[in-house]
A protein has these predicted regions:
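Cysteine protease catalytic domains with a Cys-His-Asp triad
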Residues: 1-99, 103-110
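Cysteine protease-like catalytic core of ubiquitin/ubiquitin-like
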Residues: 63-168
Length: 168
């Protein structure tokens, strides 16, 4: 049974709502729903990407991404908001932590908000590197600087998704 529907591809079911109970992890569908809602509220010049898109950015090659993401016109935005997960697998569920990466397009800078810093540092840097290439700020290899933002830290192993919603 679908409880909430937002847009054509974003819905939340009863089993997802149950995850909002204390001590449970938020799943991809809840984060996607919130990012879609936030995108609707923010409008341009902010682009809130969902977990699936960010995961694809982390795993795919830049040429494939350019073709698939060109319609988003990311270079024309002011802020890009990306939820980051540390799942290293492209073919199955996984991952144990969410954080948030914010790209400020006018200054070509990346900022990471991690409630269990520096747990997702490498994952955020990987996505930032791909984003810099997608936005044509740099080509090839080379370090992309991601500025860690001082932010509240979680006190348990389950609240990272809630913190991502808060930071976004």
């Amino acid at each position: 049974m679908v409880w909430f529907v937002y847009g054509e591809e974003c819905n939340v079911e009863a089993q997802d709502v149950d995850l909002c109970a204390c001590g449970c992890w938020l799943n991809d569908r809840l984060l996607a729903f919130y990012m879609a809602w936030l995108q609707h509220r923010c409008r341009a010049p902010v682009l809130c990407l969902g977990p699936a898109t960010t995961f694809w950015i982390a795993l795919a090659d830049v040429d494939t991404l350019r073709g698939g993401l060109s319609r988003l016109e990311m270079a024309d935005k002011e802020l890009l908001i990306l939820p980051i997960n540390n799942n290293p697998y492209g073919d199955r569920p996984g991952g144990t932590h969410w954080s948030l990466l914010v790209c400020h397009v006018p200054t070509k800078t990346f900022h990471s908000l991690d409630s269990a810093a520096p747990m997702n540092e490498e994952c955020a840097r990987n996505v930032a590197h791909k984003m810099a290439q997608l936005l044509r700020w740099r080509e090839g290899e080379g370090e992309v600087e991601v500025h860690p933002v001082s932010c509240p830290q979680q006190k348990n192993g389950a609240d990272c998704g809630v913190f991502v919603l808060l930071y976004a």
